[in-house]
């Protein structure tokens, strides 16, 4: 789940590193 969000955020180019 975390990996998916990380991949999506990275694909979108968002400054998200670790969602609370």
From Swiss-Prot:
Give the superkingdom in one word.
Eukaryota
Give the Enzyme Commission number: 2.3.3.16
Q: Broadest EC class? A: transferase
UniProt keyword terms in alphabetical order: Transferase, Tricarboxylic acid cycle
**GO annotation terms (biological process):** tricarboxylic acid cycle
User: What is catalyzed by this enzyme?
Assistant: oxaloacetate + acetyl-CoA + H2O = citrate + CoA + H(+)
Write out the pathway annotation from the protein's UniProt entry: Carbohydrate metabolism; tricarboxylic acid cycle; isocitrate from oxaloacetate: step 1/2
| GO molecular function terms attached to this record | citrate synthase activity
Does the keyword field hold Cytoplasm?
no
Please verify whether the record's keywords include Cytoplasm: no
Subunit structure of this chain's protein: Homodimer.
Record's family?
Belongs to the citrate synthase family.
Q: What else is known?
A: Citrate synthase is found in nearly all cells capable of oxidative metabolism.
**What protein is this chain from?**
Citrate synthase
């Amino acid at each position: 789940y975390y990996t998916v969000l990380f991949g999506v955020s990275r694909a979108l180019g968002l400054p998200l590193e670790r969602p609370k």
